[in-house]
């Protein structure tokens, strides 16, 4: 009996420690991934911080890191354009055994191909393009049975293209362009391959039959024999004469001049027609449903030309021309190329440019403001971006990054899927998802914006571009203001298009130059915003000339029809009449014609918070 009890005791003890060890192993996986990432970070040069906070969760706060749906393992690492330099520390990334996607392109990484990456058996896509890796590639890829994308373009790899690529039977995309591969191309029988680029190497021989379907352009810039498209034969004038097709040299010269004249004439006509069409398009630009940012942004070739500018200012900033400049704390990791290829949805057009919703490679969604008519120098633009980017307040939408090149000026913000205050106030109708805003939500919008503006004013700055389309809701459910400081970068707003009229409708009467905004003029614009929120009326309404909310509200009040001012949605709310009147009085005081008679934002915040408490 004693022996039986001992057996049961040890068996239970075995189960306890065994299950504890198993539990420790399972829960330790994410900790192991975390340590692998930290070992990678601590052993590689990274002039720009990756913002991997050791005290915060890996899966939700570390830029570039993606975990599985349960948050137990790291499955993707996206660090393109993250300013990583040097050799990848061995035994770091390769410890992420559940990794499926690895993107380290557009950095300054060097050394041989990281052989330990072949240990990543779950890998589906790897992108190491646009770095400085060198040497030959491994020959055996038997462990990469799940790989679909292999992108090694623009490095310094050499040697022959491995015949082992033929074992990557799931491969869909293979890019080895702009390296120094030599020798003949192996016969890669990969029926699932859809994209291939072997251009600009030192390859010789002919194109294998299995790869001819990709066309000659996929193999250009090599020493290959193109059997299906031989180069045109060069026929001398003597041979032409022998065949009875001799034309004298003066005649040829005359024909050439005539042809050139016709060509130049046609080109001139085409340019003029395109210019006229472009001018008309800019005046009545339609709202596209979806487009690529690449259609509007410069190519890498165009951006690279900026480095050749002789301007001293350009030379000083040469190292930053093709970069996305991030601010501290930005939970993003991408470069200009990511923006060029990002899927983009047009959100709206304002007087300072157009806004897009962009989906990045790692599925993160951002809002990109493409600025237009920037008149300041690059130095002044960057200075203003630094000022705006360093405004830190929960009620001011943070500027996450910006791009400053000769061709483009871009600002990157977090994308708000709920939409702006303008959209939520004036959405088309209920069947399109528009839900009328209740009293509490409108009040919290105004409290948040007031606090954000108050903070901006304490920095001796003015916002200058307050309107409902620039107001969003933060994570705490209060208003948040975006796009501060833009008027300083452009010419005065005087145009009569709809976007300009909306800005001018919010403008204080004393402001004759939109670049000369003040805290007092911000308060006037905020007063318009409050009246818009209380009345539910769009300042542009259905009429081209819109309405003057201040005049309309004062007119209604003077006729003692104050109750007619408020949006019906607010009137239906019980027990808020006194609060509505108090907020209306605050709005009208903010829109006083004399700046000195307007309350400051401290007083505005106090009044709004008092209304909320009551």
Curated annotation (Swiss-Prot):
LRR repeats lie at residues 71-95, 96-120, 121-146, 148-167, 168-190, 191-214, 578-601. The chain crosses the membrane at residues 252-272. It is a single-pass type I membrane protein. This is Inactive leucine-rich repeat receptor-like serine/threonine-protein kinase At5g24100. Residues 22-251 are extracellular. The modification Phosphoserine is found at residues 343, 420. It holds the Pfam family LRR_1. Residues 1-21 form the signal peptide. ATP binds at residues 347-355, 369. It is found in: Cell membrane. Belongs to the protein kinase superfamily. Ser/Thr protein kinase family. The protein kinase domain is predicted to be catalytically inactive. PANTHER family: OS05G0588300 PROTEIN, PROTEIN KINASE DOMAIN-CONTAINING PROTEIN.
């Amino acid at each position: 009996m004693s022996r039986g009890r001992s057996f049961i005791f040890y068996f239970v003890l075995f189960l306890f420690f065994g299950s504890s060890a198993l539990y420790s192993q399972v829960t330790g996986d994410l900790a192991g991934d975390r340590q692998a990432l930290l070992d990678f970070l601590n052993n590689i040069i990274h002039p720009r911080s990756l913002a991997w906070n050791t005290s915060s969760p890996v899966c939700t706060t570390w830029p570039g890191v993606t975990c599985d749906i349960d948050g137990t393992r790291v499955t993707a690492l996206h660090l393109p354009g993250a300013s990583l330099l040097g050799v990848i520390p061995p035994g770091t990334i390769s410890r992420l055994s559940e990794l499926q996607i690895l993107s380290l392109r557009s950095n300054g990484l060097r050394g041989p191909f990281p052989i330990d990456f072949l240990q990543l058996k779950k890998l589906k896509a790897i992108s190491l393009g646009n770095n400085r890796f060198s040497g030959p590639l491994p020959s055996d890829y038997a462990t990469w049975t799940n790989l679909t994308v292999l992108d090694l373009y623009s490095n310094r790899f050499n040697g022959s293209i491995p015949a082992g690529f033929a074992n990557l039977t799931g491969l869909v995309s293979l890019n080895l362009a702009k390296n120094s591969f030599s020798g003949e191309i192996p016969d890669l029988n990969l029926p699932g391959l859809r994209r291939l680029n072997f251009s600009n190497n030192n390859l010789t021989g002919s194109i294998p039959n299995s790869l001819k379907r990709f066309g000659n352009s996929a193999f250009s810039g090599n020493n290959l024999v193109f059997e299906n498209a031989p180069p045109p034969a060069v026929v001398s004038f003597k041979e032409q004469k022998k065949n009875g097709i001799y034309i004298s040299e003066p005649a040829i010269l005359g024909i050439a001049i005539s042809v050139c004249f016709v060509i130049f004439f046609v080109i001139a006509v085409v340019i003029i027609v395109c210019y006229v069409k472009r001018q008309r398009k800019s005046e009545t630009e339609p709202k596209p449903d979806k487009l690529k940012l690449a259609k509007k942004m410069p190519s890498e070739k165009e951006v690279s030309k900026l480095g050749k500018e002789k301007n001293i200012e350009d030379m000083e900033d040469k190292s930053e021309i093709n970069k996305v400049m991030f601010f501290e704390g930005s939970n993003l990791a991408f470069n200009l190329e990511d923006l060029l290829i990002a899927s983009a949805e047009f959100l709206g057009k304002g007087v300072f440019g157009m806004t897009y919703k962009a989906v990045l490679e790692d599925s993160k969604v951002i809002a990109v403001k493409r600025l237009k008519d920037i008149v300041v120098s690059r130095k002044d633009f960057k200075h203003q971006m630094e000022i705006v980017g360093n405004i830190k307040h929960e009620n001011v939408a943070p500027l996450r990054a910006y791009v400053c090149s000769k061709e483009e000026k871009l600002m990157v913000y977090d994308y708000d899927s709920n939409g702006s205050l303008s959209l939520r106030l004036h959405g088309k109708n209920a069947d399109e998802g528009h839900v009328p805003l209740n009293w509490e939500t409108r009040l919290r919008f105004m409290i948040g914006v007031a606090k954000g503006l108050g903070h901006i004013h304490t920095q001796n700055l003015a916002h200058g571009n307050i309107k409902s389309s620039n107001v969003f809701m933060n994570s705490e459910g209060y208003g948040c203001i975006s796009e501060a400081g833009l008027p300083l970068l452009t010419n005065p707003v005087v145009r009569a298009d709809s976007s300009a009229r909306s800005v001018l409708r919010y403008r204080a009467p004393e402001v004759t130059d939109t670049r000369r905004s003040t805290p007092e003029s911000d308060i006037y614009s905020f007063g318009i915003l409050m009246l818009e929120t209380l009345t539910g009326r769009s300042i542009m309404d259905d009429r081209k000339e819109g309405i003057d909310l201040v005049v309309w509200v004062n007119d209604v009040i003077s006729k003692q029809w104050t109750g007619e001012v408020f949006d019906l949605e607010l009137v239906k709310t019980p027990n808020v009449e006194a609060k509505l009147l108090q907020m209306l009085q605050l709005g009208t005081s903010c829109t006083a014609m004399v700046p000195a008679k307007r309350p400051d934002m401290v007083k505005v915040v106090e009044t709004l918070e008092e209304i909320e408490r009551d």
